[in-house]
């Protein structure tokens, strides 16, 4: 799951190198920090994390 998520996010974050490094660090941590209170369900949080990250990157690129 982590490898797939990082790969997809890497494609979207090609424009911003800073965001790319941030996403990579989050993936290594198990994306538990992204979930916050949902850290208990690491597997569920990791699956829900990529879509949110992609949305944020797209909004930044549009600006």
Swiss-Prot record:
Assembly information from the UniProt record: Forms a heterodimer with timeless (TIM); the complex then translocates into the nucleus.
Source domain of life: Eukaryota
Compartment(s) where it occurs, according to its Swiss-Prot or TrEMBL record: Nucleus; Cytoplasm, Perinuclear region
Sorted UniProt keywords: Biological rhythms, Cytoplasm, Nucleus, Phosphoprotein, Repeat
The keyword Phosphoprotein is assigned to this record: yes
GO CC annotation: nucleus; perinuclear region of cytoplasm
Single GO BP term: rhythmic process
Residue spans of biased composition, Low complexity class: 9-31, 39-49
Disordered, as annotated region: 1-63
Entry's transmembrane regions: none
PTM: Phosphorylated with a circadian rhythmicity, probably by the double-time protein (dbt). Phosphorylation could be implicated in the stability of per monomer and in the formation of heterodimer per-tim.
Ranges of Polar residues composition bias in the record: 54-63
Function of the molecule: Essential for biological clock functions. Determines the period length of circadian and ultradian rhythms; an increase in PER dosage leads to shortened circadian rhythms and a decrease leads to lengthened circadian rhythms. Essential for the circadian rhythmicity of locomotor activity, eclosion behavior, and for the rhythmic component of the male courtship song that originates in the thoracic nervous system. The biological cycle depends on the rhythmic formation and nuclear localization of the TIM-PER complex. Light induces the degradation of TIM, which promotes elimination of PER.
Protein name: Period circadian protein
Sections of the chain in a coiled coil: none
């Amino acid at each position: 799951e982590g490898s797939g998520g990082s790969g997809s996010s890497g494609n979207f974050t090609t424009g911003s190198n800073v965001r790319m490094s941030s996403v990579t660090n989050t993936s290594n941590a198990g994306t538990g920090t992204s979930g916050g209170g949902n850290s208990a369900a690491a597997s569920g949080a990791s699956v829900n994390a990529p879509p949110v990250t992609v949305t944020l990157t797209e909004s930044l690129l549009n600006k």
